[in-house]
Every structure is written in C-alpha cells, then in structure tokens.
C-alpha cells in the first residue's frame, strides 16, 4: 500500500509517456547501432528526473489540487504522504536521475535534464501556471526535453536534429494541453488557473490549437526533409498531422466543446506515439542526398 502511494505521487502515466518519446529520440540518433547500457542509463535517468519533477509539482500544487475534481484525490491532497517526506523523496529521485544521466550518458544529457527540470518546477509550477496565460507555452519546453535528452545522449551534441525534436514536441504540447483545459474547463476555472481557454475563451483557444497543429505539421516534416528520418516516417507524420488538423477544424462546428476536446486530446496521444515509433524504426544517416537537398 505504501509503495503504491509513493508510485502514484510520481505520476507513472506521465513517466511512461515521456519514456516513449525518450526512446524515439534515442533510437533516431542511434540509427540502428544501439548502445544498450547507454540506453538503459538514459531511460532510467530520465524516468527518475521526470518522477522527481512530478513529485515536486504535486507538492507545489497541493492547494489548487484540492479545488479540482481531477486532482482532489491525489496522495498529498489526502495526506497519505506528508509534504516534508515528499520533498525528501523528490530530491533523492532527482539526484539519482541527474547522476545517472551525467555518469551513464553524458554531461549534455544531464544539463538538458536540469534545464527541463528547472523550467517545469521552478518556472512553470512555482510561478507561470498560476500567474500567466503563457504558462502552457513555457511548460511545453520542459515537456519537449525528454526526446531531446534521448537524442543527445547518443550524439553528445545539440545539432539540427535535436532542434527539430525540440520544436516537434514543444508544438505538440500546445494543442494537447489546450484540449485538456477545454474539457476540464470548470476545474481550471475553479482553481483560478489562467489557461488560455479560461482567460481568452474557448473560441480563441480553438484558433490557437489550429495554428499550433499547422506549425507542428511543418516541424514533423523537417525530420525527413533534413535527412534524419525516412519516407515511411514522412507518410505517417503527414497522415497524423492532416487528421489532427481536420479534427481541430471540425471543432468550429461542434455542439459540445468538451466532447470534441476530449477526442482531440485522445488523438494527440496517438499522434505523438506514432511519430515516436516511426522515428525509432525509419531513421536515415544525414548526407547530401536528403529530401531537402533534392528539393533545392
């Protein structure tokens, strides 16, 4: 029972989702030549860092979590783990994760983890989430860190491939998060969290969702155009982007925004999982014969 509580406070669903993206970035960079010890160190290291960030987030948000239907039964809200113990737990998880990334992967992977952690805990959770409509935008940067860490654990450098991954996953976070805010509108309103749909209205949020999906679509194609991923990835990326955009556009005519937003959110998970899988298996070695070179 105690183990279950300590597991729940780390938000295992979020950890699992991030692991899929880490694997995508790692295998994309590995290009078929997998260093398995490095793979394990990277996965476990990122998992521990994400777990640490989630525990800190639970600690910081325990006051507003009480006001939201979705979060009112969280471990810290119900007092199943004391706040002091959660801080120690989060700190130990973070130290272990950063050490694994530093010594098991490379310093760059560790520093990327540190930056993602600081943005999520220090900038987003402590301030932006409660005080700015741009909190989601800032938080998207930390959400995009795991695949970049996986990629850079292999390459040891932040190149154009890493930049494209950062763009893809940051842009994906925006419509994904706005969809949550729409179908959980009353929760965010009750907790006085200034997300875009609450502050500017759902109609404005729909416009932003559409624009971000278009930008996401362009970013996903750049992996193939830049010679990092192959044609099969390109086809899947184009297909999921077009379908997701179509779902967003249908949102302008729906009668129930909450049902529409939940479906949009659900497909966002399918889309990013499909891309992570395809970049894992359909990689290319960048050379002069990239799609971008062929275009020019």
Swiss-Prot record:
Gene Ontology terms, MF aspect: protoheme IX farnesyltransferase activity
GO cellular component term, pick one: plasma membrane
Catalysed reactions, as listed in the record: heme b + (2E,6E)-farnesyl diphosphate + H2O = Fe(II)-heme o + diphosphate
Top-level taxon of the source organism: Bacteria
Residue ranges annotated as Cytoplasmic topological domain: 1-9, 57-78, 127-197, 248-268
Residue ranges that the UniProt entry lists as topological domain Periplasmic: 29-37, 98-107, 217-228, 288-296
EC assignment: 2.5.1.141
InterPro entries linked to this entry: Protohaem_IX_farnesylTrfase, UbiA_prenyltransferase, UbiA_prenylTrfase_CS, UbiA_sf
Subcellular localization(s) per the UniProt record: Cell inner membrane
CDD domains tied to this protein: PT_UbiA_Cox10 (cd13957)
Protein known as: Protoheme IX farnesyltransferase
């Amino acid at each position: 029972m105690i183990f279950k509580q300590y597991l729940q406070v780390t938000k295992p669903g979020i950890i699992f989702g991030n692991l899929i993206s880490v694997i995508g970035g790692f295998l994309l960079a590995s290009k078929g030549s997998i260093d398995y010890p490095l793979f394990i160190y990277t996965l476990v290291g990122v998992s521990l860092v994400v777990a640490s960030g989630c525990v800190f987030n639970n600690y910081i948000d325990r006051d507003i979590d009480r006001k939201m239907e979705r979060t009112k039964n969280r471990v810290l809200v119900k007092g199943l783990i004391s706040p002091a113990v959660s801080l120690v737990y989060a700190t130990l998880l973070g130290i272990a994760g950063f050490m694994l990334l530093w010594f098991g992967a490379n310093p760059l992977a560790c520093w990327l983890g540190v930056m993602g952690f600081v943005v999520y805990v220090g900038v987003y959770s402590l301030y932006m989430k409660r005080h700015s409509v741009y909190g989601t935008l800032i938080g998207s940067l930390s959400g995009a860190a795991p695949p970049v860490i996986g990629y850079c654990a292999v390459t040891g450098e932040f190149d154009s491939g890493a930049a494209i991954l950062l763009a893809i996953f940051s842009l994906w976070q925006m419509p994904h998060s706005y969809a949550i805010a729409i179908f959980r509108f009353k929760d965010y309103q009750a907790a006085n969290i200034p997300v875009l749909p609450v502050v500017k209205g759902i109609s404005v949020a729909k416009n932003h969702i559409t624009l971000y999906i278009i930008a996401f679509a362009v970013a996903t194609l750049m992996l193939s155009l830049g010679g990092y991923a192959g044609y099969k990835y390109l086809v899947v990326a184009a297909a999921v982007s077009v379908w997701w955009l179509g779902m967003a556009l249908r949102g302008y005519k729906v009668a129930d925004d909450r049902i529409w937003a939940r479906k949009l959110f659900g497909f966002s998970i399918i889309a990013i999982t499909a891309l992570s899988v395809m970049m894992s298996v359909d990689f290319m070695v960048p050379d002069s014969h990239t799609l971008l070179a062929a275009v020019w």
